[in-house]
Amino acid sequence: ATVFGGTGFVGRRLVRLLRDCGIRVRAISRHRGLSQDAGIEHIAADARDQRSVEAAVDGADGVVNAISLFVQHGGDTFYSVHVETAAKIARAARQAGTRRFVHVSGIGANTASSSPYIRSRGEGEAAVQTAFPGAVIIRPAVMFASDDAFLTTILRLLRSMPAYPIFGDGKTRLQPVYVNDVAAAITQILRQGQKPYPIYELAGPRVYSYEELLRTIAHIAGLRPVLMRLPFAFWSALAGVAEMLPQPPFTRNQVELMKIDTTASKSLPGFRTLGISPRSLEDELEAIVRPNKQGVLLR
C-alpha cells in the first residue's frame, strides 16, 4: 500500500498499523521520515510532480491520500492541495491498476461553502471520485490524540489563562474522534474483500457543544476557568494575525469550521458499519492529563 502524507498526523499511524497487519507500506512525504521502521519504505517525493506520483503508486494494491493543508503558503493553496493534487494521485492510482483508493477529507466538506478551505474539501472529493470511480471518501470529525494540535492546545491555554475566550456562543456541535480509530477504519477498508461504501463519516461516541467540550477538558484537568464568549468576527481578525506565525495556534479556516456543526450523519456508514467501537475523548484526555497534573508542561 502507498500512503501519501505518510508522516502526517493520520498517515504516520496508518503506515505503522498497515505494517503491523503484514502489509508492505510506502510512506510518501516531502521529507523522508526520520524513523527507519522495519517494513515501511519512507520515500521523499513531491506529490505535485506527476512522475513522482506515478512511481509512488506503481504496483500498489491500495493507495491512500492523507495529505491536508490548514494554512495556505507559497504555491500551496487549499485548491492546489485538496483538489488538484488529490485528483493527480487518484488518476495515477487508477492508471496503475490500484484495486482500492481511499481519500481522507473531513466532515463538513461542502462545494457550496463560502470558506475556501471547506469548499476545497468538497471539490476535492468530487475530483477524486471523477478521477477514480469507486474511490472511498473518509470524512473524519476533528481528530484528537496526545500529540494533536487540538486537545493539547486547548489544555495549554486553559492552564495558562484564568479567563478562556470561546468561539461565538459556544453552541457549535462537535463529535471528536480518536485519530488511531480513523487509521484503523482506513486499514479495514483497504483489507476487506467486499466492496466498501463510497463515503464513511467517522466520529467519536459523544456529541458536545463547544462549551461542553471545554468544560469537560477543564474538569478532567482539575481546572475551573471563566469562559468568555467572543464574536466570530473577533476570532477571524485574530486568526489572520496568528497565521503570520511559523506555527499558528489557530487559523481562519478553523474559525470558519467552528461556525458549523461537525457531527457524523446518521444516514452515512461509519464506525459501526466497520465493527469498530471508537475510543472516547474522556479516556484519551485522562492519559494526556495524568502526567501533567503536577504542573509538567505538555510538549
Identify the meaning behind each predicted range.
Residues Q95-R100, F132-P133:
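A short helix->loop->beta-strand "cap" motif at the edges of active sites that frequently abuts
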Residues I186-T251, S265-R299:
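Mid/C-terminal beta-alpha module of Rossmann-like enzyme folds, strongest
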Residues I23-R30:
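Conserved glycine-rich Rossmann-like NAD(P)H-binding loop of the short-chain dehydrogenase/reductase
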Residues A1-C21:
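N-terminal Rossmann NAD(P)H-binding glycine-rich loop of SDR-like oxidoreductase domains
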Residues L14, D20-C21, D37, T111-L223:
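Oxidoreductase cofactor-interface core, primarily capturing Rossmann-like NAD(P)-dependent enzymes
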Residues G33-Q95, G106-S113:
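NAD(P)H-binding glycine-rich loop region in Rossmannoid oxidoreductase-like domains
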Residues F4, I28, A66-I67, F101-I107, ...:
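SDR active-site strand-loop-helix element
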Residues D49, T85-K88, R100, E123-G124, ...:
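Conserved cofactor-binding/catalytic machinery of classical short-chain dehydrogenase/reductase
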